[in-house]
From Swiss-Prot:
One of its GO terms (molecular function) is DNA-binding transcription factor activity. The keyword Transmembrane does not apply. Disulfide bonds: none annotated. Coiled coil: none annotated. Expressed in roots, stems and leaves. GO terms for cellular component: nucleus. This is Zinc finger protein ZAT7. It holds the Pfam family zf-C2H2_6.
Length: 168
């Protein structure tokens, strides 16, 4: 007759051996798999993908030009892209997308908010801001002169927050 402690050790060894056997077969198609792996196929080009998400991303690339054989449609689409620009009504900077203009407009709104944000009024009078310059690329950039004279020019700046910053 086998002692109780020996029986527990044998059961644990068997369980461990079974677990190791299962782990060694990870990736193989054994038992319940049946070779029935799911494949997602693109209806346009018949390319196959392992996940629905990958297929969805691929399908989006087919939808860029629906009627590419119609030259009048292609011409109107290309003309529309070049004509579309979104100018800022405040400073005149043009953006290729409305979303970029929206982010830019946030800057103008933040300048107008009083009591919660520091605005341009904290700059000393000696700081110069040059006008927007237009380069050959068609983009406008602001040129700021950041050459401050010394720390004395920074003393006692009055901010719109009502506080005074002073360095001693």
């Amino acid at each position: 007759m086998v002692a109780r402690s020996e029986e527990i050790v044998i059961v644990e060894e068997d369980t461990t051996a079974k677990c190791l056997m299962l782990l060694s077969r990870v990736g193989e198609c054994g038992g319940g798999c049946g070779g029935d792996e799911r494949v997602f196929r693109c209806k346009t080009c018949l390319k196959e993908f392992s996940s629905f998400q990958a297929l969805g991303g691929h399908r989006a690339s087919h939808k860029k030009l629906i009627n590419s054989d119609n030259p009048s449609l292609l011409g109107s689409l290309s003309n529309k892209k070049t004509k579309t620009s979104h100018p800022c009504p405040i400073c005149g900077v043009k953006f290729p997308m409305g979303q970029a203009l929206g982010g830019h407009m946030r800057r103008h709104r933040n300048e107008k908010v009083s009591g919660s944000l520091v605005t341009r009024s904290f700059l000393p009078e000696t700081t110069t801001v040059t006008a927007l310059k237009k380069f050959s690329s068609g983009k406008r950039v602001a040129c700021l002169d950041l050459d401050l004279d010394s720390m004395e020019s920074l003393v006692n700046w009055k901010l719109e927050l009502g506080r005074t910053i002073s360095w001693s």
